[in-house]
Amino acid sequence: MSVSIQDFGKSTSGQTVKLATLKNDFIEVQLLSYAAIIHRIIVKDRKGNPVDVVLGYDTAADYELNTDSMGAAVGRFANRIAGAQFPLYEEIVHITPNQNGNCLHSGLHGFNHTMFDVALTPGETDSVRMTATSPAGTDGFPGNFDLTIQYSLAKSGLVIRYGATTDAPTVCNMTNHSYFNLNGHASGSALGHRVTVDADFYLEADTASIPTGRKLPVKGTPMDFTEEKTLGLDIGADFTPLTDCCGYDQCYVIRDSGLRHAAWAVGPETGIRMEVLTTLPGVHLYTANFLAPVTAGKDGAHYAARDAVCFETEDFPDAPNHPNFPDTTLLPDKPYSSTTIYRFDLAEM
């Protein structure tokens, strides 16, 4: 096991971006201090060859300029808030709209656009800790919001622990927006990936991907991943949630509670299997339908729509506007914490 921190490059404003590397005999993870980005996850395929399974860029500036939050920590409220406003006790909080009058991923200055401080975790030999603050009023959100993300390397996976505090009531929903291709980041379409999602329901959403508040059953629909199937099997079905989003882009309601399995995916060409575990109530399955063509990805790679799949563990989108959803209010005396694990092994083929 080894952990190191070194310079990666400069941001567009001239700030130094750090690269943290966590490595053992099976897996190597590289993280950036800009947006707490997961830059590389390298695991061995069934032939013993190293494979980088996340899409990304070679420079800090390219990460800054991309609009897809590639690999980034997203918050203070990930996903969408309808009408860029929400009730908080006796007030209506107005935040920055940045997508069709709604707020996506916290507006213009979320953590996916923030420089973090990074350091070795005191007393531990397998992790780094990243910290950042979103000042009160950033994009309209109340409260000074202090975020800590601890990235730890387990024997076969990456453990992400989020912790947040505030000095005034606000809202919180953290996720990571890595784009996975288990055949290798430069291998093209991910639609051949075999996927399972441990959810009997998904959140109904309107044409702007705003939840209606209803949970719909997956059984008998193309949304059903309770039994393993390829991403491409039903993605072209004449089914409103798929046609509205040009593919999968929905929040699934994970069974049970606590730290438990949420999803699995297998890259058929490498045999690499990824298991997603989380303490959060939802996982957003996104097949990179709107990924803009990239001609300068990592290692000279070209990326296009559907070349990856995201498993964004999360609280429910637009939760502050839906009293029937799990509460996402963050209070000064009620710190936020959640855990997500990406665990890797080799599937039987």
What kind of region is each of these model predictions?
Residues 1-349:
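An exposed, glycine/acidic-rich loop-and-rim segment of catalytic or binding clefts
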